[in-house]
């Protein structure tokens, strides 16, 4: 580089240095705006050195990284070894691909040079063919390896997909089978429960009939027939065998509880065994009720609303049962109510005794054929407590209503219950009983009144004598009649006295 003159050095001091942007070189800016284009007279090498210096001016010197030092001697295999080449060869390959424009003089030189190149190319062709064959063989081997790797990966993916598909199918089938088993078990439980309720409903007739049995042995001995003793022994044997079957059934249902059948068949022994079995079953029953009530509450989302946690419906089943059984005296009284007006043999009430005694004092003339004699007694005895009967009408009605509601809700559309209900609904909606002749006075309207015999005033057992009757009718006419037998003279004197006396207005008078 030529040495600058003094004037050039002074002018360089006054001229500001331009800001250089290294990105302009990559963006291929035009010559006028290019920062690395030099218009001064000088060698090309000097300008290139200045350009590289300007490009690398912002670089910061740094040492080699530790990772690069560690990985310098790592051998990754033949597949990852590349061929060493220079940057000029890469640029030459790119320049060869670009079309060039040659002058006519250069074409002549090129023709002469082609002959020389043909000779050289013949020598180099053999070497190139060998190199190409080796490159082809190596590339074919690499392609084969890549194809094998791809096929192996595809096989692995297929195996994974098949395993995942089989796992999903097995899981879905297992969940479906579990749901089917749960549904089948629930159906069997419902059927068993319905059968038990059906047996209980059929047993209600025998419970009602048992309330009519004699109240004690003396009454039984008075009212028994010739076959009564034999029938009683047969009934006892059947009841004892029924209890034995129930004990065996309880042992089969729950293996943890052991109920032993008593050797001596007596009511006291069977009651002891039953009470012991109930005590064992009570704890297990409470656990099961608490477990399933909690599951039902969690599934329905009742625990999410804590505002109504003090309501009875939000309490556990065990707590509800204990609350209902807390007032045992009231429940026992409810079982002794005579709702069906059943009278055991040999049982008489105080009302019946009083009624019989009152009938003895009554006369025959006062009997009324229109009023039945047992009406008042029947009204009074109905709903009273009777220690000799057992009536669980409340529990029976609850079971019956639940069974009917369940049958109506879960019955098929073609079942008899739903058909009858639908027919009743249609008849109520469509067929309204309208009397067309009841308007405009074309039909006489009347209401049948109930008999008022029960509301009649009571009659006493006393009667008026003749004097009282005569005195009553005489007072209606405003006169005073002396019913005693007197002489005519006394009557005349009394009449004269009566004419002088003004009648009193205290009595009952007709016509003023």
Curated annotation (Swiss-Prot):
**Keyword annotations from UniProtKB, A to Z:** Nucleus
Check the record and name the InterPro entries matching this protein: AATF (IPR025160), AATF/Bfr2 (IPR039223), AATF_C (IPR012617)
In this chain, composition skew of type Basic and acidic residues spans: 27-42, 52-64, 349-364
What is one cellular component GO term in this UniProt entry? Answer: nucleolus
Presence of keyword Nucleus: yes
Q: Which locations, inside or outside the cell, does it occupy?
A: Nucleus, Nucleolus
Q: Which residue stretches belong to region Disordered? A: 1-151, 342-378, 488-512
Is the keyword Ubl conjugation assigned to this protein?
A: no
Please name every pair of cysteines joined by a disulfide bond in this record. none
Acidic residues compositional bias, start-end = 104-133, 488-503
- GO annotation, biological process: maturation of SSU-rRNA from tricistronic rRNA transcript (SSU-rRNA, 5.8S rRNA, LSU-rRNA)
UniProt cross-references to PANTHER family, sorted A to Z: AATF PROTEIN APOPTOSIS ANTAGONIZING TRANSCRIPTION FACTOR, PROTEIN AATF
Q: Which family does it belong to?
A: Belongs to the AATF family.
Instruction: Kindly provide the name given to this protein in its UniProt entry.
Output: Protein BFR2
What species does this protein belong to? Candida albicans (strain SC5314 / ATCC MYA-2876) (Yeast)
């Amino acid at each position: 580089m030529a040495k600058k003159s003094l004037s050039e050095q002074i002018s360089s001091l006054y001229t500001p240095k331009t800001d250089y942007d290294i990105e302009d070189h990559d963006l291929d800016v035009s010559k006028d705006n290019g920062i690395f284009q030099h218009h001064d007279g000088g060698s090309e090498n000097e300008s290139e050195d200045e350009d590289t210096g300007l490009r690398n001016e912002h670089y910061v010197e740094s040492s080699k990284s530790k990772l690069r030092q560690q990985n310098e001697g790592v051998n990754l295999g033949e597949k990852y070894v590349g061929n060493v080449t220079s940057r000029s060869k890469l640029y030459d390959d790119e320049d060869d691909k670009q079309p060039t424009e040659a002058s006519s003089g250069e074409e002549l030189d090129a023709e002469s040079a082609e002959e020389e190149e043909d000779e050289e190319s013949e020598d180099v062709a053999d070497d190139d063919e060998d190199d190409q064959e080796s490159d082809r063989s190596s590339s074919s081997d690499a392609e084969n390896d890549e194809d094998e790797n791809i096929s192996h990966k595809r096989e692995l993916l297929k195996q994974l997909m098949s395993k995942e598909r089989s796992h999903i199918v097995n899981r879905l089938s297992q969940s479906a089978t579990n749901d089917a088993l749960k549904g089948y078990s629930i159906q069997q439980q419902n059927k068993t429960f319905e059968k038990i309720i059906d047996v209980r409903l059929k047993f209600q007739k025998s419970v009602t009939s048992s309330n009519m049995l004699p109240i004690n042995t003396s009454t039984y001995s008075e009212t028994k027939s010739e076959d009564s003793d034999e029938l009683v022994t047969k009934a006892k044997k059947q009841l004892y065998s029924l209890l034995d079957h129930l004990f065996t059934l309880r042992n089969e249902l729950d293996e943890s509880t052991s109920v032993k059948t008593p050797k001596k068949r007596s009511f006291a022994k069977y009651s002891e065994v039953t009470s012991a079995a109930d005590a064992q079953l009570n704890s297990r029953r409470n656990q099961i009720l608490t477990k399933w009530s909690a599951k039902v509450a969690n599934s329905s989302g009742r625990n999410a609303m804590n505002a109504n946690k003090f309501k009875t419906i939000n309490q556990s089943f065990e707590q509800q049962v204990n609350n209902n059984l807390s007032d045992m005296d009231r429940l026992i009284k409810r079982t002794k109510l005579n709702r069906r007006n059943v009278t055991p043999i040999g049982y008489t009430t105080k009302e019946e005794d009083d009624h019989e005694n009152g009938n003895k004092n009554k006369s025959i003339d006062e009997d009324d054929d229109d009023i039945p004699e047992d009406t008042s007694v029947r009204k009074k005895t109905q709903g009273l407590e009777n220690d000799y009967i057992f009536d669980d009408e409340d529990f029976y009605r609850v079971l019956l209503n639940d069974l009917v509601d369940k049958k109506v809700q879960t019955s098929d559309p073609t079942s008899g219950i739903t058909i009858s209900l639908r027919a009743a609904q249609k008849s109520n909606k469509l067929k309204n009983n309208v009397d067309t002749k009841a308007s405009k006075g074309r039909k006489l309207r009347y209401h049948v009144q109930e008999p008022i015999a029960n509301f009649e005033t009571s009659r006493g057992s006393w009667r008026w004598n003749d004097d009282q009757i005569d005195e009553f009718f005489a007072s209606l006419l405003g006169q005073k009649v002396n019913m005693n037998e007197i002489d005519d003279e006394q009557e005349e004197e009394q009449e004269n006295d009566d004419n002088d006396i003004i009648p009193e207005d205290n009595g009952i008078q007709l016509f003023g």
